[in-house]
């Protein structure tokens, strides 16, 4: 289907738009009644590996909310299966790695990712969506540090002690792990673009655990290589992290056409720091649990803080939480659409 709404593509290029485009991280998920109904029939891996069902889930918020972009429904750990990682997605916990990568043997056991063989269902989902979507489709992948955190820790972590111990204690091995993950995610993202994704987002959900000095030494060179390898894909790339206020300048230097801001980052400060670089964000997801008067106030605050500058994609500072009322998400979209009314 030909795009009838290219607002997000124009904003990602820093071009003027009549209003900010709006979409939400985790816009297809447990807060939706229709999604919960599907989950009664399918597990998360079953949805992701069934292109027809996965396309249906990806389309849910486009139809229900009127957002300006769809984001491929998947998990950031999806490509790890194709690298030989034994993992499970545990409800209310997240990915659990049954063969954690903590030594040279574990790193060398990671296979090169061949997306067409390892995740053909992801690419077929994209092709289906491109026939049906009136708005751009965002493909995505986890950033190397965030994926390394899962692999080394064995699952979600709060203190990241194991991953930091490897990083500090065996630096050469750490860089080898990051090189493997960088190459794998570059292939994965390029394959998504070739299948039809209009934009890409790199999620570095846990990189805020690092100091700026550690980011520069242990992560930034790999992110630079990742973004350089994505240039031939010819689509805009969003670079997003959580807890990254102190890393934003380095993240900008590492690459990406758009910088995603979490809700702890003051928007005026970020825009001054980043100059002409387009930004995405950054409403606190918890605001969507509040009364509509508060939601309106906070949405208007963010729009005012942006000051009408080009290159602003409205989003949350993190993903929609499951407790969120659907009507409140729809209300945010309506508020943004009022800007151009």
Swiss-Prot record:
InterPro entries: UROD/MetE-like_sf (IPR038071), Uroporphyrinogen_deCO2ase_HemE (IPR006361), Uroporphyrinogen_deCOase (IPR000257). It is found in: Cytoplasm. NCBIfam families: hemE. It comes from Thermus thermophilus (strain ATCC BAA-163 / DSM 7039 / HB27). This is Uroporphyrinogen decarboxylase. The record marks 75 as: Transition state stabilizer. The gene is hemE. Belongs to the uroporphyrinogen decarboxylase family. The keyword Cell wall biogenesis/degradation does not apply.
